């Protein structure tokens, strides 16, 4: 099942029972949430049956889009999410439930959507996305809708009035249906004006502007960088203790510039930008589940003078083993809320795949680092600990492949 797997949940829709595999750290991992079920019920009427091309924006493990696909056998459904783990689980759930004509892929908002002319766009709007992002998720659907196409969204109750005001205050929006409960609100709406199907989805750079929060600068070991940070990512104004420890470990090493460096979970881009400013690696590979982190880090590297041809991004749950085999240096910020088994498996893979003489710098809570070192010792991998530092419950360790 894999280290992220938590359980299987069920969803009854269109006379079928779907069995959906759920990851521990995806939204609504206990059961299909009430808001999703409410939105599906509002779309169950015969008037919606002819909506053939469907986009599920922010799909998670797929209950909305796959539920709509199960309800109408001639539908084609696109499932998109900025989280590669969500995309992976949506794809697996479509296959496990024998639902064809389903595409699952990564997209930052509408920027990477592979089609236009959708008859229906659905979304369970994330409550913590930030006002500019929520506005884009609600109004940006005009870029991909067919003429007469419908948008159907569900929001939690605290967002109800804000969303209603935004939709009712937009002259091209016609709200055609509303339903509210104590905890959720559903809105169905259309866009007037010129046909939207001729529109082209915004490019990733334009989409990224919606997430921009502020400018911030950091100096470590005499190396200074300045970033444009984003909503939805940590460390928007300063470095956390773990990032400081990893940055200091890299700057302290004083070794020759790496030909290829890989940064796992780059966040806002502090580590790759500090590494670029200090060592000028020949290639910088950025790997993350979160497409926002990849795009923000890439933009910040370019703003700090890194040539675009040197930056490569991988929207993946874990690094591609082939991308590790020529890496001289790997910086891995281990995700704090990831299942312990997943974190350990990632570290074992990193150390097993890098070439002899390459180094891995791990950053995490001290307990996590100790557990990973014990797993490496038990696996008897040829690796030595070069350095380890601790501060405020955080830890960074430098490992070298022998």
Give the label of every model feature segment.
Residues 1-46, 196-253:
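Class I SAM-dependent transferase core
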Residues 2-4, 157-220, 230-233, 366-402:
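Class I S-adenosyl-L-methionine
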Residues 21, 103-105, 176, 311-314, ...:
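General small-molecule cofactor/ligand-binding pocket signal
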Residues 34-123, 242-320:
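Conserved SAM/SAH cofactor-binding pocket of Class I
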Residues 74-75, 149, 281-282, 355-358:
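A short helix->loop->beta-strand "cap" motif at the edges of active sites that frequently abuts
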Residues 119-132, 328-341:
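A short SAM/SAH-binding and catalytic strip from SAM-dependent methyltransferases
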Residues 135-147, 345-357:
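A short glycine-rich, Lys/Arg-flanked "PGG" loop and its adjoining helix->strand segment in the class I
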Residues 148-156, 357-365:
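Conserved beta-strand signature within the Rossmann-like core of class I S-adenosyl-L-methionine
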């Amino acid at each position: 099942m894999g280290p992220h797997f938590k359980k299987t949940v069920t969803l009854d829709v269109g006379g079928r029972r779907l069995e959906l595999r759920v990851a521990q750290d995806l939204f609504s991992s206990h059961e299909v949430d009430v808001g999703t079920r409410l939105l599906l019920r509002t779309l169950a009427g015969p008037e919606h049956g002819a909506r053939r091309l469907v986009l599920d924006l922010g799909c998670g493990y797929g209950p909305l889009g796959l539920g709509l696909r199960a309800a109408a056998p001639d539908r084609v459904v696109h499932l998109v999410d900025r989280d590669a783990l969500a995309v992976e689980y949506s794809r697996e759930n479509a296959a496990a439930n024998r639902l064809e004509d389903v595409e699952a892929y990564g997209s930052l908002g509408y920027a990477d959507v592979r089609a236009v002319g959708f008859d229906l766009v659905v979304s369970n709007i994330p409550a913590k996305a930030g006002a500019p992002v929520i506005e884009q998720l609600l109004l940006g659907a005009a870029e991909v809708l067919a003429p007469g196409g419908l948008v159907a969204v569900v929001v939690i109750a605290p967002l109800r009035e804000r969303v209603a005001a935004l939709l009712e205050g937009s002259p091209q929006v016609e709200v055609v249906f509303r339903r509210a409960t104590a905890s959720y609100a559903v809105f169905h709406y259309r866009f007037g004006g010129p046909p939207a199907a001729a529109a082209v989805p915004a490019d990733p750079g334009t989409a990224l502007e919606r997430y921009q929060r502020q400018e911030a600068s950091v100096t470590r070991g005499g190396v200074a960088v300045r970033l444009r940070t984003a909503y939805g990512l940590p460390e928007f104004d300063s470095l956390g203790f773990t990032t400081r420890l990893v940055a200091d470990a890299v700057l302290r090493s004083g070794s020759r510039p790496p030909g290829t460096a890989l940064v796992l979970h780059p966040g806002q881009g502090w580590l790759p930008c500090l590494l670029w400013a200090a060592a000028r690696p020949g290639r910088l590979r950025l790997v993350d589940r979160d497409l926002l982190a990849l795009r923000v880090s890439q933009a910040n590297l370019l703003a700090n003078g890194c040539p675009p041809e040197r930056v490569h991004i991988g929207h993946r749950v874990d690094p591609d083993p082939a991308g590790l085999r020529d890496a001289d240096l790997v910086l891995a910020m281990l995700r704090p809320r990831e299942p312990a088994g997943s974190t350990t498996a990632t570290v074992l893979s990193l150390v097993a795949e890098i070439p002899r003489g390459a180094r891995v710098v791990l950053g995490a809570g001290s307990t996590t680092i100790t557990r990973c070192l014990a797993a490496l010792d038990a696996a008897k991998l040829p690796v030595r600990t070069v350095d380890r530092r601790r501060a405020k419950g955080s830890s960074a360790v430098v490992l070298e492949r022998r």
